């Protein structure tokens, strides 16, 4: 019974919440080998910039005394859409905890301006998918997490052509000039003859690199610039010390998926997105 537990909510997460959520995520991942998309680092970064939506509650918690046993959080990259993801400690499941967390979030959603909920679940999470199925949410799209080992890329033809030297590969892109345009966000812009053809965001945490938001301007697509910018990004991260490199790709984007797999990236996990429109949630 959920009456035995304490439910709270907050505008954003603090350092204490962060630690507790990470511990809860570890327990859940150890239990059923699934991934979550909690965006905790993004949330704390936005809170530090005072850019969090403070008009209402975005983080929902369930405690058994001082122990966090359930969590459901909102991430909003678009003011009209909320992405939500959460979890319940394995030994506390089937007690209605997640249902109560979702009910509280739904009340908040219906009282505020966003028009759509995107519910996220790892495709291997039986409990997550069962919950979403009960809501009759509509499938929206899927997103792969893909990973590349630096050692695999070092066997890549273009890398071998440059003697396994990432610096040489970076310099070889004589027609593609890539410069950092936002040091805080680690954004890089690629140009050809002074014209912007694309951009990418790179991250390095310990020895894990990340490639995000790789985008080629529409009129320059289909000319090999996406592959050139991807290879540049991989070589750049390797030169910075990355041993593995991760990225995310929408499974509906067949061209990008083929590009990444041909470069050596392999699927590590898949996150499924399901949609609920506000008109369908009122009264639930």
Ranges and model annotations:
Residues 89-91, 95, 204, 217-219, ...:
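Active-site acidic-Proline motif in GNAT/NAT acetyltransferases
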Residues 94-107, 134, 216, 222-235, ...:
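Conserved acetyl-CoA-binding loop-helix of GNAT-fold acetyltransferases
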Residues 132-142, 261-270:
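Conserved acetyl-CoA-binding loop of GNAT-fold acetyltransferases
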Residues 184-244:
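Glycine/small-residue-rich hydrophobic helix-like segments
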């Amino acid at each position: 019974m959920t009456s035995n537990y304490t439910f709270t909510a907050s505008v954003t997460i603090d350092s204490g919440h962060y630690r507790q959520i990470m511990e809860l995520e570890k327990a859940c991942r150890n239990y059923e080998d699934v991934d979550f998309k909690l965006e905790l680092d993004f949330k704390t970064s936005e809170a530090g910039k005072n850019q969090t939506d403070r008009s209402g509650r975005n983080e929902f918690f369930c405690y058994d005394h001082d122990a966090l046993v359930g969590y459901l959080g909102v991430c909003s990259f678009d003011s009209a859409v909320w992405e939500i993801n959460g979890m319940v400690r394995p030994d506390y499941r089937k007690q209605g905890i997640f249902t109560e967390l979702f009910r509280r979030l739904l009340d908040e959603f219906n009282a505020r301006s966003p028009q759509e909920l995107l519910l996220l679940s790892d495709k291997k999470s039986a409990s997550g998918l069962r919950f979403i199925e009960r809501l009759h949410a509509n499938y929206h799209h899927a997103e792969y997490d893909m990973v590349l080992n630096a050692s695999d890329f070092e066997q890549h033809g273009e890398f071998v052509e440059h003697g396994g030297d990432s610096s040489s590969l970076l310099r070889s892109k004589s027609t593609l000039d890539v410069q950092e345009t936002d040091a805080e966000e680690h954004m890089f812009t690629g140009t050809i003859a002074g014209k912007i053809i694309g951009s990418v965001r790179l991250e390095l945490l310990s020895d894990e690199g990340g490639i995000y938001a790789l985008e080629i301007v529409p009129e320059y697509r289909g000319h090999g610039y996406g592959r050139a910018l991807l290879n540049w990004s991989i070589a750049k991260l390797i030169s910075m010390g990355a041993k593995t490199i991760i990225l995310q790709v929408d499974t509906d984007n067949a061209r990008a998926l083929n590009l990444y797999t041909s470069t050596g990236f392999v699927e590590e996990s898949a996150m499924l997105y399901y949609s609920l429109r506000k008109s369908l949630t009122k009264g639930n």
